[in-house]
């Protein structure tokens, strides 16, 4: 043990020591040691897939925590595994009972439903816990240098490797990170949480790894732990981390699939969808929203019947695009298609929007397009409307509002609206990095991904979302 525990951690370790003694009396090692088999899921091989260009993700099953208390009351491991299997490199399962409301039995329950390695996340202090983790079917364990000296760490890591399990070596400061390097840990986690007071500094991983940048072997993988709540944070830290361990920020959302996609891929929309295969392709690549255009003069206009087929192809959040159409028409389509939002591209007044809000289903958002001349130079003057959930900043010409395939001067977007706005207009795989740098909530792509109007190029879709990730 290290000589001075942080106060909160010290209490946890005291309780864990008691738990180990009680568990050993209840389930002696001799009763199951002969039944143990080596893991057949390679944690290290899985983590080698991660890179600073395309990070790996350790997604966590976490019911509660000391810092947040109960996080997910409806803790359905089957539901969680069903979502995580599509996105995770490794799945972490909390097994601490007192502080995280976890159980070792949770490991097998998740593992039997997925193909990824399972990480046993606990305060591991003894060989007994390592054996117990493998008995519970874990493929890797967490070892925390904040509670283990080098000799103890080496003993536990060696045993884990003998059982075919990998080790995620957790550090929380520069001294521990230096120890992890000296111990030749293959996967090093940097916990951005202060173990003294449970506060989070998301820049800790950057500060520590940059200090030791010239000492980190190229094959060593760095994982950022704790504090990831937005996709932009992942983008900001990718230059220092090969992967991210994420739990609390996902577990707090009812719609887990949406939460994972939003966090991993960002909140981006592909508009002008007309074909089933395009809906499936953009969802597979990471789109969160799909735009269906009902503006009659648009080259991408579709009928209700076409839309009904499209919305069954993938669980995108669908947005209907309208322009100066009746409230009755908009509400009819919103109800029939169970739209996530309606996007207004015309001259709809504040009173029209107020009435529309009263008539729409309560869970259907209203998005408002603000179209700026592609050659314009005057800053936008926008009177905010409490009934508008999101703004779309798009380009226009004298002939057309939106869907022009042209960009506008992005400096004209009011800075204070960027956190609730999406950027549209002439966005292509080539200018996505610059578009992302504008700081809007997400991007809205359409003609820049097309072969011709209404037909998406799957090659361009793949190229675009590679940039977006």
Swiss-Prot record:
Can you provide one Gene Ontology molecular function annotated for this UniProt record?
phosphoribosylanthranilate isomerase activity
Q: Does the keyword Lyase apply?
A: yes
Q: Name one GO biological process term.
A: L-tryptophan biosynthetic process
Pathway note: Amino-acid biosynthesis; L-tryptophan biosynthesis; L-tryptophan from chorismate: step 3/5; Amino-acid biosynthesis; L-tryptophan biosynthesis; L-tryptophan from chorismate: step 4/5
| EC number(s) given by UniProt | 4.1.1.48, 5.3.1.24
Q: List the keywords (alphabetical).
A: Amino-acid biosynthesis, Aromatic amino acid biosynthesis, Decarboxylase, Isomerase, Lyase, Multifunctional enzyme, Tryptophan biosynthesis
Q: Which residue ranges are recorded for the region named Indole-3-glycerol phosphate synthase?
A: 1-267
Q: Per the record, what are the reactions this protein catalyses?
A: N-(5-phospho-beta-D-ribosyl)anthranilate = 1-(2-carboxyphenylamino)-1-deoxy-D-ribulose 5-phosphate; 1-(2-carboxyphenylamino)-1-deoxy-D-ribulose 5-phosphate + H(+) = (1S,2R)-1-C-(indol-3-yl)glycerol 3-phosphate + CO2 + H2O
Q: Where is this region: N-(5'-phosphoribosyl)anthranilate isomerase?
A: 268-469
Pfam hit, one: PRAI
Q: Which Gene3D superfamilies match?
A: Aldolase class I
Can you tell me which residues the record assigns to a coiled coil?
none
User: What family is reported?
Assistant: In the N-terminal section; belongs to the TrpC family. In the C-terminal section; belongs to the TrpF family.
Q: What does this protein do?
A: Bifunctional enzyme that catalyzes two sequential steps of tryptophan biosynthetic pathway. The first reaction is catalyzed by the isomerase, coded by the TrpF domain; the second reaction is catalyzed by the synthase, coded by the TrpC domain.
Self-association state and partner proteins as the record states: Monomer.
Q: Which HAMAP family match?
A: IGPS_B, PRAI
PANTHER family cross-referenced by the UniProt entry: INDOLE-3-GLYCEROL-PHOSPHATE SYNTHASE (PTHR22854:SF2), TRYPTOPHAN BIOSYNTHESIS PROTEIN (PTHR22854)
Q: What is this protein called?
A: Tryptophan biosynthesis protein TrpCF
Q: What is the originating organism of this protein?
A: Pasteurella multocida (strain Pm70)
């Amino acid at each position: 043990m290290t000589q001075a525990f942080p106060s909160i951690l010290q209490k946890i370790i005291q309780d864990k020591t008691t738990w180990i003694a009680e568990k050993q009396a209840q389930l002696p090692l001799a009763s199951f040691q002969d039944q143990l088999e080596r893991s057949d899921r390679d944690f290290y091989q899985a983590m080698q897939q991660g890179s600073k260009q395309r990070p790996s993700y350790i997604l966590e099953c976490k019911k509660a925590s000391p810092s947040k208390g109960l996080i997910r009351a409806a803790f359905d491991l089957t539901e969680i595994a069903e979502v995580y299997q599509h996105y995770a490199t490794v799945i972490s399962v909390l097994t601490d009972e007192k502080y995280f409301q976890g159980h070792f039995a949770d490991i097998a329950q998740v593992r039997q439903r997925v193909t990824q390695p399972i990480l046993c996340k606990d305060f591991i202090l003894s060989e007994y816990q390592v054996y117990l983790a493998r008995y519970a079917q874990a493929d890797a364990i967490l070892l925390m240098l904040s509670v283990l000296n080098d000799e103890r760490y080496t003993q536990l890591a060696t045993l884990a490797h003998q059982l075919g399990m990998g080790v995620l070596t957790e550090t929380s400061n520069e001294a521990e990170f230096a120890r992890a390097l000296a111990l030749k840990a293959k996967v090093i986690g940097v916990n951005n949480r202060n173990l003294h007071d449970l506060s989070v500094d998301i820049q800790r991983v950057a500060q520590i790894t940059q200090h030791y940048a010239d000492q980190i072997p190229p094959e060593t993988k760095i994982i950022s732990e704790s504090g990831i709540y937005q996709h932009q944070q992942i983008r900001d830290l990718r230059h220092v981390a090969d992967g991210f361990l994420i739990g609390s920020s996902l577990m707090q959302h009812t719609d887990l699939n949406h939460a994972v996609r939003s966090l991993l891929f960002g909140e981006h929309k592909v508009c002008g969808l007309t074909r089933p295969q395009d809906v499936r392709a953009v969802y597979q690549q990471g789109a969160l929203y799909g735009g269906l255009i009902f503006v009659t003069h648009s080259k991408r206009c579709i009928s209700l019947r076409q839309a009904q087929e499209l919305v069954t192809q993938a669980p995108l959040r669908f947005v209907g695009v309208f322009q100066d159409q009746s409230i009755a028409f908009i509400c009819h389509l919103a109800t029939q298609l169970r739209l996530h939002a309606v996007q207004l591209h015309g001259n709809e007044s504040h009173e029209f929007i107020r009435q529309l809000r009263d008539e729409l289903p309560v869970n259907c958002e209203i998005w408002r397009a603000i179209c700026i001349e592609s050659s314009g130079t005057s800053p936008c003057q926008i009177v905010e409307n409490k009934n508008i959930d999101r703004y779309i900043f798009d380009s226009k010409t004298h002939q057309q509002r939106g869907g022009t395939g042209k960009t506008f001067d992005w400096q004209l977007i009011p800075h204070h609206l960027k956190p609730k706005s999406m950027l549209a207009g002439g966005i292509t795989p080539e200018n996505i990095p610059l578009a992302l740098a504008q700081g809007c909530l997400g991007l809205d792509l359409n003609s820049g991904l097309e072969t011709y109007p209404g037909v998406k190029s799957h090659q361009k879709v793949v190229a675009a979302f590679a940039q977006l990730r």
